[in-house]
Amino acid sequence: RQGKVDVASILDAAVKKNGQKLDWKHSIVDLLKALDLDSSLTARKELASELGYTGDTSDSATMNIWLHKAVIKKLSENGGKVPAELLD
């Protein structure tokens, strides 16, 4: 089995390439942009649903916090080395 992928360095490089100031460690919108994924509210609601979010999607602030944690957790579960402070 190969070593874990360093998610932080890949995302930092993606942010640099993107040219925008993206705070992927704290913002789901910025994380999705760094991954070159749709970061619209509709897309985030769909992603939250796919990942098992059971809260109110009209409360986007709460959903975004949950979604950020869920995406980071998925990256970690799928072989990504994620900074420890980003995991619960």
Locations of the language-model features?
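Amphipathic alpha-helical interaction segments
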Residues: 1-88
